[in-house]
Amino acid sequence: MAIAGLVHGHADGFFSHSLGRRDVRIAGIAEPDRALFDRYANKFKLDPSLYHADLEELLRTVRPQAVLVYTSTYDHRRVVELCARYSIPVMMEKPLATTYEDAQAMARAARAAKIQVLVNYETSWYPSNRAAYELLHSGAIGELRKVVVHDGHEGPQEIGVQPEFLGWLTDPKLNGGGALFYFGCYGADLMTYLMDGQRPLTATAVTQRIKPDLYPRVDDEATIVLTYPKAQAILQASWNWPFSRKDMEVYGRTGSVVTVGNSDISVRLPHETQATTRAAAAIQKPYNDPLTYLRAVVLEGAKADALSSLETNLIVTEILDAARRSADSGQTIRLAD
């Protein structure tokens, strides 16, 4: 596989967890900033011959089986359209795009080239989220009524992200917004998953800039309310939490399930007076790890999972785009009839 870009901070975690694996091999890294590549090369002892300044030159000469994307969100469209030209599948860090227009363009390119375009969310690999889905769809808590999702941390500057990462996270063009896009996407993805791909009727969003001295150009606080014929979602995305969090509350007509970290759930079933906490079942391979999953999809024809699929993430981008317009206008945006 090849790497496109190194400006996304998650690239560091990728190298930390992948370099010792035998089932994947890095065939090339495309990054226009040679100093940035050298920093990673020194830290992870990467072969300098992996370096390419230009992605198309890498694709043409190396012909990787897949491309992992660690660019800004804005650059996802360029990467996907380029990879589609060479019929190479892509997995990118969430979210899919900064605009619904870009998301649709990527979908057209992917479908024309018959390539997979997958979106990697940390929460896709949480057994707790899978367990919440299974419990809901088993009928144990009744028909879905309300979902509340909390995502974020103290703020990218406060937690000390890399300077190249902070640079585009706080750029409204390159990130699509601030916390609204970067953390709102998690809840939009999970709600679309829980709803089996149903689009919401409306999106209403409120954003704030609580720390304008740190984030003068983008929001650092966002709440999105989505409505469905018989359900509602409240997505709370923030760079103002006192700690890092990615958790979800799912309320059915007769019971509830709350995710506790990435591996436990707190469940209250009908006629119970209090919730009980239990361990979520482990996720079965190949859907338990992003690289195992990517390899299975590319080489073995495994089905794209709903959380990372292009179809789900088109809806996620439609939601985020509508939420941004709602926050800007102060109006509720209608998505579906």
Annotate each language-model stretch with its function.
Residues 1-45:
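N-terminal Rossmann-like dinucleotide-binding module
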Residues 44-109:
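Beta-loop-alpha module in the N-terminal Rossmann-like domain of NAD(P)-dependent dehydrogenases
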Residues 66-68, 296-337:
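C-terminal helix-rich "cap/oligomerization" subdomain common to oxidoreductases
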Residues 124-206, 210-214, 330:
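Predominantly a Rossmann-like dinucleotide-binding segment in NAD(P)-dependent oxidoreductases
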Residues 182, 188-264, 291-303:
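Contiguous beta-strand/loop segments that form the cofactor/metal-binding neighborhood of enzyme cores
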